[in-house]
Amino acid sequence: MKKMTKAITLGLVLMVGLLTAACPQRESIAGIEANPSKFYNKEVGIAGTVRDSYGLNIPLTQIRGGIYKVDDGTGSMWVVTQNSVPSKGTKIGVKGRVQNGVNYNGKNYGLGMVEEDRKIR
């Protein structure tokens, strides 16, 4: 019985370790802005509130996307998405790659993130 309990415990510890290793580290926007070269083209996570959002979504087509600004209380960052944009005021967590010179619709938004995944809180 003790061997089975140890095996189950070891399996759970390994599973938790793998799950946390697969998740990007959550960073403050101020930390990213203070040292952008450290995060450039790296997968990171940010969380905060959507302050602005501009999107395009044409019904009955696959055409959608846009840009939205996330504010975490330390700063704000533009996020480019190929999905529909979240509404202003939405609490959100975003995983993506930090890019310099994020462009959308012909306008440069400076340091930003290209969204890979998001969670609405």
Regions found by a protein language model. Give the residues of each.
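Sec-dependent bacterial lipoprotein signal peptides
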Residues: 1-23
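OB-fold and OB-like single-stranded nucleic-acid-recognition modules
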Residues: 19-121
